[in-house]
Amino acid sequence: GLGVVAGRDVVIVANDATVKAGSWWPETITKILRAQEIAMRQRIPIVYLVDSAGVNLPYQEGVFPGQYGAARIFYYNSLMRRYLHVPQISAVMGSCIAGGAYLPALSDVIFMVEGTSFMGLGGPNLVKGATGQTVDGETLGGARTHTEISAVAHYRAPDDASCLDRMREYIGRLPRPAGVAHAVIESKPPAAEPAALYGMLPADHRLSYDMRHILDGLLDGGVLDEFQPDVAREMLCGHARIEGRPVAVIANQRGVIKGRPGERPKFGGIIYPESAEKVAFFIETANREGLPILFVQDVSGFMVGAEAEHAGIIRAGAHFVEAMATASVPKIVLTVNHASGAGYYAMAG
């Protein structure tokens, strides 16, 4: 249906998990496609509240075939994301299996809820039958798995109400219709005095410091709504405001960055394959949303070595550089310590 969220006209698609686990029937496909077409014609955001077991397999002969079968949903997802720049925001509100998982994965951003969200191509029972592996749902595809390990999802909330509140905040800062500027609100002073920034940086550029303290002196109220905070912590990405204007922020974190249990620490100021992919996705999203990007760089370059090469550092780095180079929004660069190597160029140098 159609509604208003945070003052914005939006299209909403929501599954009812009390009816056949929210599975897709032939009529479901027709309704989703119609909703997507309205969003594309009107150029308004579309919100997916997903709680679906995917296709109702006994009825798949009416779901898959034809020009307007289930695959067209994903075609429309891709059109909106790559060409039309129609914002797509998904919340995984329950179990999302197979096609129910691809729908949010093709959105711009994904919100998940701790303890109740599940997203995967197959559930624990299917995994047990297909591979013999016994795994619980949270480990297989829960909110922490997808916001800390797989990086498929981008924001994690403690409960449904918090998830919906965060979605409202996100929608409230989305780009306005063509020709209308982003909403500018009353500015707040930074959390730290800008003049104090000089005392925060070490005299020796090799020593560590917390980049968040630098951002405290730049951003309104020092507030950064961080994007994927538990993924690639050596790179900070997020949404903020400066003088009341919305901006996207990308910054290098310094020091030794602790990894997940069993994972080796990373060196701050170095771009790893995982951080390159995280930043590339964030740049592409900010570009679609028409947000200026502030790069706060303190970078020594890209990671080298056999492990980095095996992880595809060249491919990931190229994705980072391509996203930065092709973004058409304003890019502002602040070098706070030093910048060198290809990392300088990747960080919009």
Set out the residue ranges of the language-model regions:
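Ligand-binding clefts of soluble mixed alpha/beta catalytic domains
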Residues: 1-349
